[in-house]
Amino acid sequence: MNFQGLVLTDNCKNQWVVGPLIGKGGFGSIYTTNDNNYVVKIEPKANGSLFTEQAFYTRVLKPSVIEEWKKSHNIKHVGLITCKAFGLYKSINVEYRFLVINRLGADLDAVIRANNNRLPKRSVMLIGIEILNTIQFMHEQGYSHGDIKASNIVLDQIDKNKLYLVDYGLVSKFMSNGEHVPFIRNPNKMDNGTLEFTPIDSHKGYVVSRRGDLETLGYCMIRWLGGILPWTKISETKNCALVSATKQKYVNNTATLLMTSLQYAPRELLQYITMVNSLTYFEEPNYDEFRHILMQGVYY
């Protein structure tokens, strides 16, 4: 359905005139609105993923909570956007859910493609630190992102040095009332996420915990440096079992993974991925140590 020209009424009774379609993904279509600072994200209500996003926005992404966390952690920027409004729209046969969210700029995937599919190591390390800061905030609220990738990392419209991790349709609550979810497989959750970057736990049907997001970020940084992961081509065939088995093969062979992917083994990624692979499912990472490792790649 083309929503352009429709007037949507949100939960606060404000109206939004839907403009042209500017993006489409697995978790909804994105349209401009009559306010250039915002876009509207729409999908059928029955799909459920936009409800997951809405719940995450309303429960976790409160500006006051983010600001307080930044001050307490002495971190200048947390790359998470907030939700302006939400609502439902009913057509003749289908009911739709919509969110009104901040309008951002180009995504990192477009930037990488415009740079011959690779970025300088310094840039990759800086991006890695920004995403690490962002997922640390999420993790300390008890949530994992579950789908970190370049197309889900978006530049600010004005300040191109600010990045935002978007698309919260696969967020998982791994902590509740201070208790970690148990290490129990759910066959319905197997292989969630983007196959090339899906963490091994997710392949097996476990809820993505902190180590899963960090694992995915490691795969992403290899790709942003211009590497081709050993399972990149396999993932295009949608052979989930073979992708999972190939990832598992490299868990204790980080140097081989890097040499196979990049033809060299950056010290920072060797240390980062090795440390990720040493984490248990329940363990809280030492984010400062991970930041320190990546920061070395910024200056050396």
From Swiss-Prot:
Detail the disulphide connectivity of this chain as listed in its UniProt entry. none
Which locations, inside or outside the cell, does it occupy? Answer: Virion; Host cytoplasm
Task: Identify the residues that the record assigns to the Protein kinase domain, covering every copy.
Answer: 16-282
Quote the cellular component terms of the Gene Ontology held in the record: host cell cytoplasm; virion component
InterPro entries, per the entry:
CK1_Ser-Thr_kinase, Kinase-like_dom_sf, Prot_kinase_dom, Ser/Thr_kinase_AS
Q: Name one GO molecular function term.
A: ATP binding
Which stretch is the leader sequence? none
Cofactor(s) for this UniProt protein: Mg(2+)
Q: Which residues form the active site?
A: 147 (proton acceptor)
- PTM text: Autophosphorylated.
Q: What class of enzyme is it?
A: transferase
Q: Which Pfam families match?
A: Pkinase
- Gene deletion effect: Up to 650-fold decreased virus production.
Q: Which terms are listed as keywords in the entry?
A: ATP-binding, Early protein, Host cytoplasm, Kinase, Magnesium, Nucleotide-binding, Phosphoprotein, Serine/threonine-protein kinase, Transferase, Viral release from host cell, Virion
Q: Where does ATP bind?
A: 22-30, 45
Q: Quaternary form?
A: Interacts with host JIP1; this interaction increases the amount of MAPK bound to JIP1 and subsequently increases the activity of transcription factors, such as JUN, that respond to these complexes. Interacts with protein OPG198; this interaction inhibits the repressive activity of OPG198 pseudokinase on viral replication factory formation.
Indicate the family of this protein: Belongs to the protein kinase superfamily. Ser/Thr protein kinase family. Poxviruses subfamily.
Which purpose does this protein serve, as stated in its record?
A: Essential serine/threonine-protein kinase that plays different role in the viral life cycle. Phosphorylates the host small ribosomal protein RACK1 thereby customizing the ribosomes to a state optimal for viral mRNAs (which contain poly-A leaders) but not for host mRNAs. Facilitates viral DNA replication by inhibiting host BANF1, a cellular host defense responsive to foreign DNA. Phosphorylates host BANF1 on serine and threonine residues; this leads to BANF1 relocalization to the cytoplasm, loss of dimerization and impaired DNA binding activity.
User: This protein is called what?
Assistant: B1 kinase
Q: What is the source species?
A: Vaccinia virus (strain Western Reserve) (VACV)
